[in-house]
Amino acid sequence: MPGLAILGLSLAAFLELGMGSSLCLSQQFKAQGDYILGGLFPLGTTEEATLNQRTQPNGILCTRFSPLGLFLAMAMKMAVEEINNGSALLPGLRLGYDLFDTCSEPVVTMKPSLMFMAKVGSQSIAAYCNYTQYQPRVLAVIGPHSSELALITGKFFSFFLMPQVSYSASMDRLSDRETFPSFFRTVPSDRVQLQAVVTLLQNFSWNWVAALGSDDDYGREGLSIFSGLANSRGICIAHEGLVPQHDTSGQQLGKVVDVLRQVNQSKVQVVVLFASARAVYSLFSYSILHDLSPKVWVASESWLTSDLVMTLPNIARVGTVLGFLQRGALLPEFSHYVETRLALAADPTFCASLKAELDLEERVMGPRCSQCDYIMLQNLSSGLMQNLSAGQLHHQIFATYAAVYSVAQALHNTLQCNVSHCHTSEPVQPWQLLENMYNMSFRARDLTLQFDAKGSVDMEYDLKMWVWQSPTPVLHTVGTFNGTLQLQHSKMYWPGNQVPVSQCSRQCKDGQVRRVKGFHSCCYDCVDCKAGSYRKHPDDFTCTPCGKDQWSPEKSTTCLPRRPKFLAWGEPAVLSLLLLLCLVLGLTLAALGLFVHYWDSPLVQASGGSLFCFGLICLGLFCLSVLLFPGRPRSASCLAQQPMAHLPLTGCLSTLFLQAAEIFVESELPLSWANWLCSYLRGPWAWLVVLLATLVEAALCAWYLMAFPPEVVTDWQVLPTEVLEHCRMRSWVSLGLVHITNAVLAFLCFLGTFLVQSQPGRYNRARGLTFAMLAYFIIWVSFVPLLANVQVAYQPAVQMGAILFCALGILATFHLPKCYVLLWLPELNTQEFFLGRSPKEASDGNSGSSEATRGHSE
């Protein structure tokens, strides 16, 4: 495929003066407008000998033509014309442009840069103490192409806070906002590209590589960044060197040969070549000449698409070439636009219509691009089509196109434009435009771009591979990079269909670490990690011990977490107990509601009235205490579990004790004594008994908390792969402390009711209390051995079950039968049945209640 070098660097790409008719292409590099944009493009190059022999600060003649620079300039022209022809960004305004050739040399670049900063209508930069109101000839500058030039112009324009948007300068140093506060670019920093390169090396396990850079700022900085990134990713650089720029001197030739010799001696198969196109041209020329063994060359963006390199004779002998290329939106109409402009440049009528006299800039600086007016349009047009179809130019063309749109968007924001007009009452200074460019978003075709804090844009990269088609290669996309690398292995071509291996030592297996031998960390032996340790990273040199809360088998690559083990809310046992809680609590609330509804009934009054309801409330609180047992143990929950369970139970049992005492008194003592004692057991003194019992239990709980406080324990020994967390009981004595009061109350209740003989024809309250206390003792006596033998992790579930079944036993044997009478046997809800006397007898104080009761029964 004919490349751009055939068009731009050989005699076939341009004609010397006098060969063919003159064009007026250079006269199209300026257009008037309300706001002028400066442009710096590599329209030509100069002979190196001319620069070496320069002894005076005179002008430099650019004799060779660069088609790439022309295409980039055309991209800027097309973008400006699009903006002017539309109304979305700058309605009612026109952008102008003033484009100059940099000749790819700093000396040449400074001349138009000085002209851009000259005061409007003059050719000089005035000296002021304050440049706030200074109005230069241009509002912003697009370019230059190379980082070397941008380092110079960036500092110069930053002094005046002149916005500068480069379409290709990618050096990371340009991201320094203190040095280059007004510099922006529509390409990512080289650091991003090198991160992609390091990711590519890691993907193919190429950890033994050579790194070469051009002997200039671009190459040296690239090598420095790559070296740091490679070291942090475990990639060893066997050899690092600088390649001099293309020179025919013997000294430079010796340096190139020495670089090639050291690369060969390092026995690497992969070389990262971060260099300018001219340095790569020099390196590959001698590599082909000296028959260097083929390598995998990882290219920087600066030379991956360079025709200077791609058209070298026998270039296929260098090996495989891979590199990342910034992705950009396609501009399908660009080819037609360039062809139209080139055709107009050859049209005498059109050329005659252009202004014939020299403008101010040309009088000072000479023609903008004299060599542009003597090119062969047919070769240039065909070369453009071929390079665009091969994907070698569109990313640079789009970057230039986007740079213009970024400035237009900033001007749009500064002028507060709407769909119909812009506010142009006052002139816009460059520094005002700059204020709107920081972190600004803008659109270029279908892409939304944004300047980051360092003035760069974040764009996706395509991974390109040279595929050989005689005589020159073409670029195939074989992957993408946007923070992560995506490869299309089926599209990659390798010698012998095998991916080259570039390693000093084989990769260690999983669970093995490296024992370095020699000086390079990539040369090592592999050693297994023992149990209890693991290999943290593939490039580790020592096994990392597992933490106390972790474990690992032998030859492990990770430590498995020892999951905390406790009675979780979602475990089946807990869910079952929670369902039981809902049942018991629901029955308790239903009983309480029923007794409140029938408050004045004989049954409720005979059961103790308010004391009975208080006992039910305590029973409900006793049930709710089970909610303290599931879940991850905490100090507060551990301390609260036993007191919050047994204090409500004491309140409940104390009310039952009062009823048991009343039953005992009524049955075993003379009537006169019984009436006197019952008045105390039912009156305010009854609450004193409840209070005293509760205070005794509270005192025992306080003793329990102070003398034997439970604590949250993390047990690492019980389970091999889990860590047990539980509330540890200090001793069995502590458990007995909180049960003393309740056990005594229950025992007294049992004695007071078990020995009592029920009277026929009356409700047998003693039987319900007897069975309730039996249920209490059976459950809590069974609880002790079960708690002692069950796995520690499930001890809270045992306590929950004991609490709920205890509550259910009391409820089912004592309270629910009374609810049954209230709902389904209302005819028994009488004073005779529950108190053993009629209303009349009660009022007369008659004690012959037994006969009345027997009469009711008959």
From Swiss-Prot:
Q: How does it sit in the membrane?
A: Multi-pass membrane protein
TM segments?
Answer: 576-596, 611-631, 645-665, 688-708, 736-756, 768-788, 797-817
GO terms classed as biological process: detection of chemical stimulus involved in sensory perception of sweet taste; sensory perception of sweet taste; sensory perception of umami taste
Any one Pfam family here would be: ANF_receptor
Q: Subunit notes for this chain?
A: Forms homodimers or heterodimers with TAS1R1 and TAS1R2.
Protein name as it appears in the record: Taste receptor type 1 member 3
Signal sequence annotation = 1-20
Q: Could you tell me where this protein is found in the cell? A: Cell membrane
Keywords from the named record: Cell membrane, G-protein coupled receptor, Glycoprotein, Membrane, Receptor, Sensory transduction, Signal, Taste, Transducer, Transmembrane, Transmembrane helix
Checking InterPro entries in the record gives: ANF_lig-bd_rcpt, GPCR_3, GPCR_3_9-Cys_dom, GPCR_3_9-Cys_sf, GPCR_3_C, GPCR_3_Ca_sens_rcpt-rel, GPCR_3_CS, Peripla_BP_I
